[in-house]
């Protein structure tokens, strides 16, 4: 079986377009970079991980002397004839010709999610962002290489995994960016931009020379067709950066400021579910129900979606991950699953919650779990949850961010109505009356929306 690295050098995967940057994306990155270049000092431009040379073509059309670097000899065969001689076969992370002289450095470097991490000590020793580390994500090293290649005042345009802009554990990378450049823009791309992956990506535009001062253009595009200079100006928002937060949703989605609301963290205690992986991930034919993200539905806990059991004597049994009647299970991770909420309404629904979810325990009578479940999965609130989400292929919301969600405190009568409605909804679902259960959900959803808007 071939390793991912070996697959990378297989022409078949290249030809299928696995690593192809769509022309609309490459053309936009080159256009945006040129617009923000103060002057052509050297007239040099490069792509340190050039692949088939799509960026080189657009740079060359604009009159630049171009250099492309790629470790894969195959790219010479698949590159267009007009840039074939401009590609040098060498490791883009090694010392490159004209390093520190390029007016423009653009590209779409490989991501560690596909190729793993760099462990070579000689390579790691050359980069500030890998100092003191046994390994580093390849895209982080390439990001620093883009900075090394650009001259002071040169413009960088690079496609990166979204996590670099949002993950709390990658703040040191954002600090490096802000310390060494004037960030011009961060533009989030649609999930289907690249063939074969739904991982989130964004384009970083920066002018070398820091520290950063001033405002940044933030934008999210829903289609590659919106990647034009005029469209980005319409869609984007010029913002003052907050701390090291560089992901557009934080700035583009307005934070809810709700009257008579309390942060979720003041209403509940939050603990994480737990589980085992590898050889210890063993289920039993009977025992304690296992609550995976699949069973957490808008209509309550539904074990028909994924019926598994945990033996009390196995390593899969986690005492702190046991959810009791009256507690709320909140799915914290996953595209399409994040923000799912369900109340444990009976002893039969109690169980061990896996690590995709949080368990919320009320510490006040200002709300009840039934209202909270309806409230947190309301579309308006789910948008706020997504605003605070982090990650690339698998997004998640940290506890400290979830605790910031404002919760409107309703009248006691509405709390009682939510309790009745939730239990009735679960009952109807168990009886197979899905449409009737759904109508209850929609009715409460509308009432909560009215409460939020008013």
Residue ranges, per PLM feature:
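Conserved S-adenosyl-L-methionine
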Residues: 13-107, 112, 160-163, 179
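Mobile active-site "lid"/loop adjacent to the S-adenosyl-L-methionine
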Residues: 110-138
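A short glycine-rich beta-alpha junction/loop motif
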Residues: 198, 204, 350-358, 389-416
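Sequence-specific dsDNA recognition surfaces
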Residues: 265-279, 294-325
């Amino acid at each position: 079986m071939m390793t991912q690295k070996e697959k990378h050098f297989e022409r078949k995967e290249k030809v299928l377009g696995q690593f192809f940057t769509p022309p609309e994306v490459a053309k936009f990155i080159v256009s945006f970079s040129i617009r923000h270049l103060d002057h052509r000092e050297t007239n040099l431009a490069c792509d340190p991980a050039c692949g088939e040379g799509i960026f080189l073509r657009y740079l060359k059309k604009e009159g630049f002397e171009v250099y492309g670097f790629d470790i894969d000899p195959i790219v010479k065969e698949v590159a267009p004839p007009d840039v074939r001689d401009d590609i040098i076969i060498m490791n883009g992370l090694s010392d490159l010709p004209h390093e520190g002289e390029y007016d423009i450095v653009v590209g779409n470097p490989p991501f560690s999610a596909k190729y793993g991490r760099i462990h070579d000590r000689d390579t790691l020793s050359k980069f500030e962002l890998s100092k003191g580390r046994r390994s580093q994500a390849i895209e982080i090293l390439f990001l620093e290489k883009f900075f090394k290649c650009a001259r002071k005042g040169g413009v960088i345009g690079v496609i990166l995994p979204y996590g670099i802009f949002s993950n709390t554990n990658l703040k040191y990378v954002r600090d490096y960016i802000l310390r060494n450049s004037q960030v011009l823009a961060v533009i989030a791309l649609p999930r289907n931009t690249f063939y074969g992956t739904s991982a989130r990506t964004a384009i970083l535009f920066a002018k070398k020379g820091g520290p950063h001062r001033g405002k940044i253009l933030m934008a999210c595009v829903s289609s590659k067709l919106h990647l034009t200079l005029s469209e980005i100006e319409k869609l984007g928002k010029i913002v003052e950066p907050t701390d090291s937060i560089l992901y557009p949703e934080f700035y583009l989605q307005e934070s809810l400021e709700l009257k008579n609301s309390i942060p979720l963290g003041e209403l509940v205690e939050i603990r994480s579910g737990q589980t085992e992986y590898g050889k210890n991930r063993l289920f039993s034919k009977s025992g304690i129900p296992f609550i995976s993200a699949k069973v957490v539905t808008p209509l309550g806990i539904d074990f028909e979606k994924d019926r598994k059991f945990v033996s009390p004597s196995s390593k899969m049994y986690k005492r702190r991950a046991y959810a009791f009647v009256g507690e709320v299970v909140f799915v914290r991770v996953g595209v399409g699953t994040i923000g799912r909420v369900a109340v444990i309404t009976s002893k039969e629904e109690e169980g061990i919650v896996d690590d995709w979810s949080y368990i919320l325990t009320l510490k006040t009578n200002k709300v009840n779990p039934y209202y909270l479940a309806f409230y947190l999965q309301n579309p308006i609130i789910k948008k706020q949850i997504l605003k605070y989400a982090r990650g690339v292929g698998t997004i998640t919301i940290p506890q400290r961010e979830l605790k910031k969600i404002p919760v409107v405190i309703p009248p006691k009568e509405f709390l009682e109505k939510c309790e009745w409605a939730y239990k009735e909804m679960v009952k109807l679902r168990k009886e197979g009356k899905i449409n009737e259960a759904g109508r209850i959900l929609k009715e409460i959803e509308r009432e909560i929306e009215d409460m939020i808007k008013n």
